[in-house]
Amino acid sequence: HSASSAASDVYKRQLLMVTNSSHAIAVEDAKFSAPEIHRGLWPHMVMAGLFRVMPKRAGLDFVMRGKPIDAMEAERLGLINKSVSKKDLDQTVSDLAKELSSLAPGTMQFGLEAYEKQDSMSFDEALPFLQKQIAKTFEGPDAKEGIAAFLEKRDPNWD
């Protein structure tokens, strides 16, 4: 999983990158578009990620009409996590990276892998799979350290 940031307008390959990132931050004046329909084309590759982050109707409207949306609308529809001023973009991305890297690294990786696996399962298949993952998480070193740190009222040491 990755984070992406957009300092300008986003379309085509950049849009694919944004839709496939776990976190996406854009400047407030960025525009997002999939204009292929205006050229007699369809954004087939973009759909792989688009419908995983945007509601179906909003995503279909976005690709069927090919009209750009602004960063506020992109945030409202779930295409991005947050829109910020141009001057705050680098600091916001840096703060996010710092926050994520300060969390339990083994558990983060394990959890993201479990997310990927269960994403293609039916609800009834996912529940027993995820129940097993909970047990494995509790057995891991991050859980042991996190619980000990909580009980000892200290910050965890993930090293």
Mark where each language-model region is.
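A general structural signal for well-ordered alpha-helical segments in protein cores
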Residues: 43, 47, 56-59, 105-111, ...
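C-terminal long alpha-helix characteristic of the crotonase
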Residues: 25-30, 80-128, 135, 139-141, ...
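Single conserved hydrophobic/aromatic residue that forms the stacking wall/gate
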Residues: 1-7, 11
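Key positions in alpha-helical "signaling/recognition" and NTPase switch elements
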Residues: 17-18, 74, 150
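Well-ordered beta-strand positions
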Residues: 22-23, 61, 65-67, 73, ...
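Short acidic/histidine-centered micro-motifs embedded in hydrophobic/aromatic stretches
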Residues: 65, 77, 110-117, 149, ...
